[in-house]
Amino acid sequence: MYVDPGIDTSASNLKWVLPYCKPDLPRVVGALLLFIANNTMALTIPILSGIIVDRVIVGGHADELPRLCGLMILMTIIRVGARYGYQMWMERFGQNSVYRLVSDEYEKLHELDFTYFNHTRTGDIMSRLTSDTDAIRHCLSWVSYQIADCVVMFVGALCVMFAIDWRLALVLACVTPFIFVLTRGLSTHAHPLFFAIRNSLASLNSMVEENIEGNRVVKAFVREPYETEKFDEHNDDYMQRNMALAYNSRKYMPWLDGLGFSLQLITLGLGGFLVIKGYMTLGNLVSFNSFLWMIDGPVRQSGWLINDWQRFNASCIKIRKLLTEQPRIVEKPDAVEAVKQAVTIVEQVKHDDEATGATGAPVASGTSGAQQSTERKSCPLHIKGDIRFDHVSFAFPDDPETPILKDLDFTVPAGSKLGILGETGAGKSTLVSLISRFYDPTVGHVLIDGIDARDWPLATLRSQVCIVAQDTFLFSDTIGGNIGFGASGDSDDRYIQKMAQIAGADNFIRSMPQGYDTVVGERGVGLSGGQKQRLSLARALADNPSILIMDDTTSAVDMETEAEIQKHLKEMDGGKTIVAIAHRISSVKDSDLILVLEHGRIVERGTHAELVAAHGRYWDIYHKQLGLQSGVAQGF
């Protein structure tokens, strides 16, 4: 990440965002120089206007007019060029800063675990990455120099006006305290309103995103009017929040505009009187009137700038909350070295056990400690595929009183197949999520190759334990690109096609007009459920995992295709450990161990033959699926 979000969580929003701006500070220095040039010209041009009136129009020195006008034109050109330059540099400054901020947000999202995404709406996350970051960009790129411009112009104009005529300037200055009181009131009331607008916009985005994703369900149930009504409610809430902000501005802006008009009235009235009395020249009055916009402009603009500043603060609060979110699944420090050491110990114990079992007495390994240390450092982290659940119980962190899994205890040797059956909600998907460490067990240990899953580096564990989830997701890419997503960078087309063949997808892919170059939507639009499942399986196989978890992966596939896939999986090299969750007996009957789950507990375990012979829950499921009556033989 570009900036550590936990460095100073109590810092103000402006101080918090500065580290993202730091690499572009030289650009800000350049913009500041152009800003000074622009404002110097802006403060000088009105003085020249007064000189022209006094020297040329009143004094009759017409020969000075070309020189003074030429000087004004030159200053105007310099001012326009300088203003364009610093505006472009500040825009680049804001864009670069937000680029780094969005990158950190996106990286943070990848660090967060399933618990966060289970309880955070997609629209809220999208608002953090889009509208909230744009509010920060707007503040850095535009509001920052507008505030500086207003302050410099206001103070600079007052100073010059005091130098021209202190009496008129003093009267104008007496109006400014009322301006600051009004702007303070506007700011105080605007802050909670902007925060409410941000929340309402996030809710609206979530609702729209949910409907776009579920548009097929909406159409299938003819719920368009209902969803439109829901959208209108969210949209109306967003409108009302914005109207509340508009009412707040309307309450203060007329007073601010009125004070701005009073400045012009005082200048013309009192200034005209002073000219008539001879206390100031007509040229000075013209200069005063030209400076007036530098007083009036900041007064009128202050209300809008305060609104933008409060929008910036509300957005910062939202983004900081995301960046400081703490993931529950955290990799231990020095996990790589710790696992290498643990692997060496496990291998040594196995070696000693084998030696003792063969001779009846311990046998020296013949390898020194230094040699073992060297081997450990050079040993690549590879998972063989042993899985052990040691009295594991689990409850979701936000509901610890409701256990999902209860005292699970079983072992799956490397290269074998585990089948899991159970009713919907029995905890099957949660069980396999513990293997990839998407969650940590509440009680007990999940051991991979004899090492606690919490000790493995997350990248190693998840790269070699691959889940083909129930909810198939395909990226907006070609079919080949979707399958290759799970493969290493050096995989070629032949490898991708081989994985598709194993998953039973090659034939239907080749039947498409563009074959593997066919582009599919993010949800696999245009593909059947079975085709999407087979592509997801091919993507997982392309990752060449040591442990392959199939979460009801072939539920939408016909029996013949499923049998072909099972055959190909058995023939694969490498001896993968396969964990198959299914509702169909045919998907798990060839497993070395079958678990039957009910309400988070293992109620039966064994091979297919053992469970059928036991005449228990598995036997009931088996006979119902085969369409048999209890005790009636049908040749199976």
Residue ranges with predicted function:
Residues 61-67, 160-177, 244-323, 349, ...:
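Helix-loop-helix
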Residues 1-42, 57-69, 86-90, 94, ...:
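Membrane-integrated ABC transporters
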Residues 15, 26-47, 51, 68, ...:
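Alpha-helical segments in transporter systems
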Residues 2-7, 59, 95, 103-127, ...:
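Short intracellular "coupling" helices and adjacent cytoplasmic loop segments at the cytosolic face
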Residues 23, 27-38, 71, 75, ...:
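Transmembrane helices of ABC transporter permease
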